[in-house]
């Protein structure tokens, strides 16, 4: 994971991070990274310090996803089945594309990218602020990678995991309903004809 950060940042940005950590007041928070959380307020994602805090923040995010934003839950699930080749040693190109795809899908998915990154055996919770800053620097691109890219990668690199998720998606149930109605209309055309 440290290789990700070394490749990820330009030298000037690395110097900024180093200077921030050397300041007498410790790391300076560049801004608060939040999502709409529980009634007690929003969690500052950039201040997560350990696996338990990350898990709590992720669960809070998942519990607050509205039914209208079902695609956010689906993309979280597809992201979880991406294999280690997307977040492990030497995976920078794939790892950064996952970040771009999540950002292009929704700015709310920062917590998903951090949880995904934390799957790396070398993940350091002290880099979460840096990941938040990196996320903030991603520009959304209309023609860029999106949630559809993550679904494609999951299908290519973990077909059984992706299929298990697909069978629990709203899209799957809509397709099943449409196919059943269409099959019924073909089998019984007189019942569907208007007269």
Language-model regions, residue ranges each:
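Alpha-helical structural motif
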Residues: 50, 71-75, 95, 109, ...
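Contiguous ligand/interfacial binding patches
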Residues: 122-125
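Low-complexity, intrinsically disordered short peptide segments enriched in small/polar/basic residues
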Residues: 14, 30, 42-45, 72, ...
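DNA replication initiation modules
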Residues: 1-83, 151-157
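Substrate/cofactor-recognition hotspot
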Residues: 116-120
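Death-fold interaction domains
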Residues: 127-171
């Amino acid at each position: 994971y440290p290789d990700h950060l070394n490749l990820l940042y330009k030298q000037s940005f690395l110097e900024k991070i180093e200077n921030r950590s050397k300041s007498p007041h410790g790391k300076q928070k560049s801004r608060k990274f939040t999502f709409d959380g529980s009634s007690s307020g929003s969690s500052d994602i950039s201040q997560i310090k350990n696996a338990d805090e990350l898990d709590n923040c992720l669960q809070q995010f998942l519990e607050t996803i509205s039914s209208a934003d079902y695609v956010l839950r689906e993309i979280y699930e597809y992201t979880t089945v991406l294999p280690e080749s997307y977040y492990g040693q030497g995976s920078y190109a794939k790892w950064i594309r996952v970040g771009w795809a999540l950002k292009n899908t929704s700015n709310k998915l920062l917590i998903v990218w951090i949880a995904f990154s934390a799957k790396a055996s070398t993940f350091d919770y002290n880099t979460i602020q840096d990941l938040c800053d990196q996320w903030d620097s991603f520009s959304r691109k209309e023609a860029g990678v999106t949630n559809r890219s993550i679904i494609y990668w999951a299908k290519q690199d973990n077909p059984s995991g992706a299929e298990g998720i697909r069978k629990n998606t709203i899209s799957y149930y809509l397709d099943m309903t449409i196919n059943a109605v269409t099959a019924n209309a073909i089998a019984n055309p007189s019942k569907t004809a208007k007269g």
